[in-house]
């Protein structure tokens, strides 16, 4: 997960390629969008109530998608969405995550580019600003918000290559910048098929979840907290996306959302770890902050 970094696939694609969709919806008034873009949580908002995921399939000079592969990706996405909804119920939260872009074709887009894509951080930084502009111009967010009745929209970018998946999130301190929050999901990791648990892990970042397997000064994740989670919550999906035997499952998730992740998502108002590990307050829920806005 990264503050201002998204997978190079979309960033380059949006800059150099063409974004299209079979449908041509009508936009709402720009004033509505302007008001929506003042929310401190970024485009994905809070994972309570209804949220929508927009699927964007990326093709470059040496990779493309066929229909069978796209449906396979959509299957994993549906597994991830169902998992997240079940986890919400564990914390008595009503979570509806609309993610099936075949049942909802207005949520499926494609990107083409002649540039060869990879997951390098350097390119992600270079093209992130271009991505924000291009998505705003090409994706009908107003129509999506009106049709699905939500101000919670995340973007999932699918790249048919091996790479490290990542997510670009909005911080309170960003103001109007980096508003559109996106997860870039590679079809493979170390040349093995990626699993649904990684999809869920990256998607949860969109709504405020932190990586719990590594320290982060910006996000207030200390080495002591990482050790604590590893000992007490080793199956938390933000700590590990593997099974207890270290395996990756394509269409099944055996991990769960434990209380530290639930706190960051806004599903729990407080937890013992908040005081013990000096976790920052979350206001509003599900929001990222580097602490300078408090």
Residue ranges and their predicted role:
Residues 18-31:
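Sec-dependent signal peptide cleavage junction
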């Amino acid at each position: 997960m990264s503050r201002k970094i998204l997978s190079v696939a979309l960033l380059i694609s949006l800059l150099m390629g063409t974004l299209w969709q079979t449908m041509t919806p009508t936009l709402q008034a720009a004033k509505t969008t302007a008001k929506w873009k003042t929310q401190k949580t970024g485009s994905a908002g809070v994972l309570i109530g209804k949220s929508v995921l927009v699927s964007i399939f990326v093709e470059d000079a040496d990779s493309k998608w066929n229909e069978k592969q796209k449906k396979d990706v959509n299957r994993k996405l549906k597994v991830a969405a169902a998992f997240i909804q079940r986890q919400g119920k564990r914390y008595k939260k009503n979570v509806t995550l609309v993610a099936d872009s075949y049942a909802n074709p207005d949520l499926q887009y494609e990107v083409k580019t002649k540039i060869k894509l990879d997951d390098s951080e350097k390119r992600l930084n270079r093209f992130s600003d271009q991505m924000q502009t291009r998505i705003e111009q090409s994706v009908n967010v107003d129509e999506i918000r009106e049709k699905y009745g939500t101000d919670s929209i995340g973007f999932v970018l699918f790249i048919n290559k091996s790479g490290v998946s990542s997510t670009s999130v909005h911080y309170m301190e960003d103001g109007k910048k980096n508003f559109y929050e996106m997860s870039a999901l590679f079809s493979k990791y170390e040349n093995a098929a990626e699993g649904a648990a990684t999809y869920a892990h990256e998607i949860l970042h969109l709504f405020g979840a932190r990586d719990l397997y590594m320290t982060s000064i910006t996000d207030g994740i200390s080495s002591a907290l990482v050790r604590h989670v590893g000992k007490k919550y080793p199956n938390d999906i933000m700590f590990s996306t593997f099974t207890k035997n270290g395996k990756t499952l394509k269409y099944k998730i055996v991990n769960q959302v434990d209380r530290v992740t639930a706190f960051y998502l806004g599903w729990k108002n407080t937890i013992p770890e908040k005081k013990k590990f000096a976790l920052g307050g979350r206001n509003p829920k599900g929001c990222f902050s580097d602490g300078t806005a408090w």
